[in-house]
Each structure stands twice: as structure tokens, then as C-alpha cells.
Curated annotation (Swiss-Prot):
UniProt entry tagged with the keyword Transmembrane helix: no
MF-aspect GO terms: endonuclease activity
Provenance organism: Bacillus anthracis
Family membership noted in the UniProt record: Belongs to the uve1/UvsE family.
Keyword DNA damage found: yes
Protein name, per record: UV DNA damage endonuclease
Broadest EC class assigned to this enzyme: hydrolase
GO terms for biological process, alphabetical: nucleotide-excision repair; pyrimidine dimer repair; response to UV
Superkingdom: Bacteria
Origin organism lineage: Bacteria, Bacillati, Bacillota, Bacilli, Bacillales
Amino acid sequence: MIMRFGYVSHAMALWDCSPAKTITFTSFQKLSKQEREDKLYDVTKQNLEHTIRILHYNIAHEIPLYRLSSSIVPLATHPEVEFDYIGAFTPLWRKIGALIKEHNLRISFHPNQFTLFTSDKPHITTNAITDMTYHYKVLDAIGIADSSYINIHVGGAYGNKEKAIERFHENIKKLPAHIKKQMTLENDDKTCTTAETLSICQKEKIPFVFDYHHHMANLCEEPLEELLPAIFETWSHTNIVPKVHISSPKSKKEFRAHAEYIDLEFIKPFLHVAKKINHNFDIMIESKQKDLAMLQFIQELSSIRGIKRISSSTLQW
């Protein structure tokens, strides 16, 4: 069983390398037309250049997974902001794409919790489609839209989870088919359990990104031993291995909050279930210390008898 690792957005080991610098709309409004254009251009350019630095760091450390920052283009989906963020940066998008393709990196996006399809308010669904379209356009500009995924949660229950799930199935029909084809769903820590998310994924033929921390915070009746093989099966129509999210609780009191690093004892039960299936899968680390937490966790895992480190960020068990 091969386990490959990655992390989210910011490389903590790199100095001054945020790929998510932004500008608020309030600040944006105070600028002249030319100043607005210059500011958007400068911030986006810096984010793209920082992303390139991070990709070089990932390549040097043999880190095969990476989640791009959704904030790579500031105010990209704001209705009052017009900005050709694709055409203005074609060489940089292509440079990012060339690095990803040459080194066979697995890239993803994870829009925020407001991108959902369970609301009964049409504008919420419209905004979700706008946001998904933005993420797809960025992947397309990079040249990896047909091989990369945009991950979201099912969405809020709005007082009636059953009705909300019904709305998801209706509202998702409004998302263009080529974008839906590149989306994944994740179980959340308060609303849709692992079993409920699995059922939705099976019905919609959407790959399921399993989050173990969320699962433990929002348990369902079905045991993980039954769920995980079916979760992995949702990836069978793709040409890539399943991906899971790993983090551990900040504390017992703040169980849903992510800790700085990974608590191996918290994760061990999941790993033992996965080992019984013996299916290759990828792991996205969601700890606060990102790449540093990932590398520490890999080091800890590799010290366990039977687990072999076969590259900087890949283990064999």
C-alpha cells in the first residue's frame, strides 16, 4: 500500500511566500480606476510568483500533492470587479502548469464553506456556480482542468437535512457538466455524515474525499470498516487513487478545530482500517503547520515497523 502526502496552500518553511495575499473590496473602492487595475495586477502577480516558489519547494522535497489557494486571484468572483486574471497572466499560468505536468503533481482546490448547493435561496446556488467556475477557469488556464479536482462540502441542513440533500441533487444540475465532472465531495463535521455523503457521491457519481477528523466529530452508525471500501470505490471511474484529509483535534474542548501538528494516536485507527483494504491512497494534511506538520507526521509514521519511506513524502506499508 502506497501513501503519498501533501499539504494546503502555504509552505510554512518558506519566508514571505503567501500565495493568498489579498485586498478587501472596501480598500479597492477607495482607489482610482488605474490604481484598482494596478493593485489587482500586482497582488495577483505576487500570488502566482509565490505559488511557483512553493511548487519548486514541493518538487525539491518530493511532495506530490498540493492544494492551491482559492485566494490566488483577489476579488475574482466579486460582482463589481472586472479583471482579466486569465489573459493578463498567461505566461505565469503556463509556467505553473509546466511545473505541475513535468513533475506529475496532484493539484486540487477547496472553495470555502459558502460554496454549497443545499440552499433554497437561488442566489446562493448562483454564487456557488460562479465560484466553481472561477476555480475551473484557473485550472484550465494552468492546463490541468481535466486531471484536477475542486472539493466542496455538501452544505448546510437549514433545519431539515433530508430536504437540504434533495435540494443538493436538484441544484447541482445547474452546474455545467464539465465542471461537475471535476468536483469532489467531503463529509463535514456538523451536517452530512460519512454515510450520507457517500450516498450522495454514489448517486451523483462524484468522487468522495474522506475526512477522518470530520468523521470522528460527526459519527454515523455505519462502521468505517464498511464505509471506506465504498468510499474508495467512488474513485474507480477516475484514473487517480482516492484522497483523504487528515488532521487532529486542537483539544477535547475544541475538538473540531485543527491542531498545529498531527497526533499519530488519533490517526492510527483510520490507518489500520485502510491497511486492511490495502489500497493505494493519497493524504492531504490539514494541520495548521501545513508542510512542517506533514513532514513530521511522515517521519513518525516511517518509524513504525513495516512502514517504509520510499521518498521524502511517500510511504509504503
